[in-house]
Amino acid sequence: MKSYLDLLTDVLENGSVKGDRTGTGTISVFGRQYRHDLSKGFPLLTTKKLHFKSIVNELIWFLSGDTNIKWLNENGVKIWNEWATEEGDLGPVYGKQWTAWPTKDGGTINQIDYVVNALKTNPNSRRILFHGWNVEYLPDEKVSPQENAENGKMALPPCHLLYQFYVVDNKLSAHLFIRSSDSFLGLPYNTASLACLTHMLAQQCDMGVGEIVISLSDVHIYSNHMEQVKTQISREPRKLPELKLLRKPESIYDYKFEDFELVGYDPHPHIAAPVSI
């Protein structure tokens, strides 16, 4: 994906040095966008190997509404461990807001149900979206993620926070807004996850897939990722893999990792980098 490598180059060449919540330090640019036509392959990076199983299982976990890392750990996903309490709780993060947004009368709203129904019944609507930015549950930046979760707040606020969908010629496209993008570690996962979700929704609604568009606000590279980024930029992108969904589950909530087949993934080796907490 040359567009992703171009984005990394943009940050390296034009980024401003900034401090950040983690204390690591970054170089950052503000306001960028890139897109990918899903008919040209599945957007899983080939310039470094990514763990596809973690991407799919995290998305399945989000859609389940779960906010405890126990299921993730049991399914080989460790990417949330640093922020969870000893009991594995993360507070009302992504899945809670997606599937059970609290209402003032004590009920909940399932935004994913709304999206699926709207795609099936009113695909020309400009209101087909969901988001996770529930101000009432945003964390207190003065305390740790674990303390926030223990206090009923999110351990971390959503980075990938608003998803909107668009249908033309019976093909589904998706637009994601990311407020804060760790461009080396986080963005490749977000891109592939968005593509998976688009394929899943399209299948559930008997549509084809169009393109994904990602709008990024604060796009940064952490100071301890600079050499890794330069290594990645030096690599030549290879042909993208294809994604096949092997069955059509009864609902968007019933997918399993075994339903996803990645064909022709031939990436360069993995590039390790530390996570800033």
Curated annotation (Swiss-Prot):
Question: Part of which pathway?
Answer: Pyrimidine metabolism; dTTP biosynthesis
What keywords would UniProt list here? Cytoplasm, Methyltransferase, Nucleotide biosynthesis, Transferase
Using the UniProt record, name the top-level EC class of this enzyme in a single word. transferase
Q: Name one GO cellular component term.
A: cytosol
What is an example of a Pfam family matching this protein?
Answer: Thymidylat_synt
The reply to whether Magnesium figures as a keyword in the UniProt entry is no
Q: Where in the cell is it found?
A: Cytoplasm
Reaction(s) this enzyme catalyzes, per UniProt: dUMP + (6R)-5,10-methylene-5,6,7,8-tetrahydrofolate = 7,8-dihydrofolate + dTMP
**Gene Ontology MF: a single term:** thymidylate synthase activity
Q: What EC number(s) has UniProt assigned to this enzyme?
A: 2.1.1.45
Q: Which family does it belong to?
A: Belongs to the thymidylate synthase family. Bacterial-type ThyA subfamily.
Known function: Catalyzes the reductive methylation of 2'-deoxyuridine-5'-monophosphate (dUMP) to 2'-deoxythymidine-5'-monophosphate (dTMP) while utilizing 5,10-methylenetetrahydrofolate (mTHF) as the methyl donor and reductant in the reaction, yielding dihydrofolate (DHF) as a by-product. This enzymatic reaction provides an intracellular de novo source of dTMP, an essential precursor for DNA biosynthesis.
What is the annotated quaternary arrangement, including any partners?
A: Homodimer.
Q: Which PANTHER family match?
A: THYMIDYLATE SYNTHASE, THYMIDYLATE SYNTHASE 1
Under what name is this protein listed? Thymidylate synthase
Organism, by scientific name, is Pseudomonas putida (strain ATCC 700007 / DSM 6899 / JCM 31910 / BCRC 17059 / LMG 24140 / F1)
Its taxonomic placement starts with: Bacteria, Pseudomonadati, Pseudomonadota, Gammaproteobacteria, Pseudomonadales
The gene name reads: thyA
